[in-house]
Amino acid sequence: SEAKLKEAAKETLKTTTDPLEKLRSHCLSQGYSGLLSLGRLFRRLDKDRSWTLSKEELSRGVGQFGLDLSDGDINKLFSSFEKDGQSGINYEEFLESLRPEMTEPRKKAVEAAFKHLDKTGDGVVGLEDIKGKYSAKTHPKVVKGEATEDEILKKFLNMFETNTSVDGKVTKKEFFDYYSGLSKAIDEDEYFVSMVNIMWXX
């Protein structure tokens, strides 16, 4: 469950000394959409659309995200992603390394769900398309009678509305950012894959 995911991440945050693991745990302690929020923050800091962040921007972004890292930790993070001849770090690569690993069957299920939504094949889907295809009937809270399908849909759309870099649109990377957080909370591949398939009526 999301609550267990948050708790486990908070515990890791207390014990780990690795700055990348600290940031990953901090993302997961925010729930399924933590990585999505961080991605949005980085994309907003990238005013000149260079897809890179300077050390100062990285430090500011991490601070705004609510994680207090030392200068030493920021330097370590930055230097591990810095490439020769680049003036900053590529934050898409950085976010990719923060994503909890997904197994092949899970990646394929998320990939297929996105393809199902992305009719034009341009790697971007509108929130209206998501609204028309998303099914919340197997959502744990709906199954337990704690929420209606409509409430879950609104919450799901709201999460993407507040965390995407382009208003009203969701990129493939943002879609994967969300599902990698959700995947971390589910042990069995089979359950995850069937849930994604039912969610998007695939």
Curated annotation (Swiss-Prot):
Task: Give residues annotated as binding Ca(2+) 1.
Answer: 84, 93
Q: Which GO terms describe its molecular function?
A: calcium ion binding
Q: In which tissues is it expressed?
A: Striated muscle and brain.
Q: Which residues form the EF-hand domain?
A: 33-68, 69-104, 105-140, 148-185
**Residues annotated as binding Ca(2+) 2:** 118, 122, 129
Entries under InterPro entries matching the protein = Ca-bind_SignalingProt, EF-hand-dom_pair, EF_hand_dom
Q: Which residues form the signal peptide?
A: none
Other observations noted: This protein binds calcium.
What is the annotated role of this protein in its UniProt record? Possibly acts as a regulatory protein and not as a calcium buffer or transport protein.
Q: What is the protein name given in its UniProt record? A: Crustacean calcium-binding protein 23
